[in-house]
Amino acid sequence: MSRRGTAEEKTAKSDPIYRNRLVNMLVNRILKHGKKSLAYQILYRAVKKIQQKTETNPLSVLRQAIRGVTPDIAVKARRVGGSTHQVPIEIGSTQGKALAIRWLLGASRKRPGRNMAFKLSSELVDAAKGSGDAIRKKEETHRMAEANRAFAHFR
C-alpha cells in the first residue's frame, strides 16, 4: 500500500470575464504552447459570434452544447484471456464534461473555415441544436457501448 496520501481533487477555477468554470475548462483545452491569452481571445470571439448568430445568451448556448455532447457511458479496452474487449463503463459528470469539451474542440478544429473562433462558434451552435461532428461522436460512443453490452461484467 502506498505511503503517500491521495491528492485532493482540485476544483476548476472560473474565468475573469464570465465567472464561469465551464468557460475556463474550455480555455484550458484550447490552450496550445502556453499561450493562454490567445486561448481567451479565441473563446471570447467565438462567444461574440454565437451572440450574433443566435441572439440569445451565449453561455446558455455553450451549456446546452456541452450538455448535449456529454456522454453517459463509454467503452474502455480491457484485456481478458489474450483478447481485448471493449468494456462499457459509466462516466462521471466531470469526466463526461471533459470528454465533451475535447470532442467539441476536435470537431471544430477539423471544420473547414477561416479561423478557430469562427469554427468553434459554428460547432457550439450546431451542438446546441443537436447536430454536428461532436454529437455524432457521442452517438457513436453510445452505439459502441450498446454493441459491447455483453462484456459489461468484465468491469
Swiss-Prot record:
It is found in: Plastid, Chloroplast. One of the primary rRNA binding proteins, it binds directly to 16S rRNA where it nucleates assembly of the head domain of the 30S subunit. One of its GO terms (cellular component) is small ribosomal subunit. Its main location: plastid. The keyword Plastid applies. PANTHER family: RIBOSOMAL PROTEIN S7. InterPro entries: Ribosomal_uS7, Ribosomal_uS7_bac/org-type, Ribosomal_uS7_CS, Ribosomal_uS7_dom, Ribosomal_uS7_dom_sf. Belongs to the universal ribosomal protein uS7 family. The keyword Nucleotide-binding does not apply. GO terms for molecular function: rRNA binding; structural constituent of ribosome. One of its GO terms (biological process) is translation. NCBIfam families: rpsG_bact (TIGR01029). Part of the 30S ribosomal subunit. Keywords: Chloroplast, Plastid, Ribonucleoprotein, Ribosomal protein, RNA-binding, rRNA-binding. This is Small ribosomal subunit protein uS7c. Pfam families: Ribosomal_S7. It comes from Yucca glauca.
